[in-house]
Amino acid sequence: MKKLVLARVSTARKQADRKEDDFRYAVTGVSTHKHDSIEFSKGCDVLDYSIKTSHASLPSTLKGETIADKLADMYKRDAANKYVYISDDNVAYIMNKCEFTAFVLAFGRLERDSQKNGGNMKVRLLRESTRMLAWLNA
């Protein structure tokens, strides 16, 4: 796992958008970007990276009964090759699929999506904790 401290350059209103902009600036030198909602099987957040932040969720369209099943389905269809968790203090932890799987199994939970979004089970990351940061920095 690689670690990258990000400069705070974004002025986006949403936290997840700000962190994505800060990561984009660190890897491409470009900070402005129109945020869109692109299907995970058709594109990535930044280059070939999928960005996650505290309390993020994986796509609710994933098939499977367990977190491991849903991750396996995601990896079959995902356009991303690398996964990034950006901490509350703007540190990016860049992971491969194996590391990301271990991270999600340790710090993810299954929860039901809202009825307006179909009510399917989805994987949500827990809020950032000292235990999570210790795991990321080990």
For the regions a protein language model found, what residue spans apply to each?
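Nucleic-acid endonuclease domains
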Residues: 9, 16-138
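Short beta-strand segments enriched in small/hydrophobic residues
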Residues: 2-10
